[in-house]
Amino acid sequence: MTIRHDSITAELALRLVVPGGAPVPVAATVRYEPADPYAISIGFRTGADEVVEWTFARQLLSDGVRRPAGDGDVQVWPAAQSGGRIVCLSLSSPSGHALFEMPRSEVLAFLRRTYSAVPLGGESDIIDLDAELALLIWGGPER
């Protein structure tokens, strides 16, 4: 199996859902690093030089395109609106909660690119879980 190692990024035009108001456009960059094959990151520009980044499972985003997924700080689910199909992304933290709408076609295009770099099920070919577990338990390689 051939695995690419370059970062995969995409710019997404999200909409922040504002209760009782019009949605607010938010620029975001979604990123996938094949060296960390189970995760994706999404960075929200909050100011000229500030980015708030969230990292969560690639599988969560993939599942959420088709059906509601997640039961913690990150939840993803499909929805429809007059402009077409979207993916909703709910993020919760002690400092607040945000609900974003993402164009489904853009999310699917990004996911396809990640799966061409590291196919579904190929994540364990990149990460040696035994070595990672040994590092957590003993602070070094297996003994």
From Swiss-Prot:
* Cellular localization per UniProt: Cell septum
Function text: Involved in sporulation-specific cell division. Required for early stages of sporulation. Important in the process of growth cessation prior to sporulation-specific cell division. Recruits cell division protein FtsZ to the future septum sites and tethers the contractile ring structure (Z ring) to the cytoplasmic membrane during sporulation. Stimulates polymerization and filament length of FtsZ in vitro.
Report any one BP term from Gene Ontology.
spore wall assembly
Q: Which GO terms describe its cellular component?
A: cell septum; divisome complex; spore wall
| Superkingdom, taxonomy of origin | Bacteria
Q: What is known about its subunit structure? A: Interacts with SsgA. Interacts with FtsZ (via N-terminus).
Broad class of where this protein is predominantly found: other
Designated name of the protein:
Sporulation-specific cell division protein SsgB
Q: Keyword Cell division on this protein? A: yes
Family stated for the protein in its record: Belongs to the SsgA family.
Asked if the record carries the keyword Cell division, the reply is yes
User: Which gene is this protein's source?
Assistant: ssgB
Lineage, highest ranks first: Bacteria, Bacillati, Actinomycetota, Actinomycetes, Frankiales
Keyword terms: Cell cycle, Cell division, Septation, Sporulation
Q: Which organism is it from?
A: Frankia casuarinae (strain DSM 45818 / CECT 9043 / HFP020203 / CcI3)
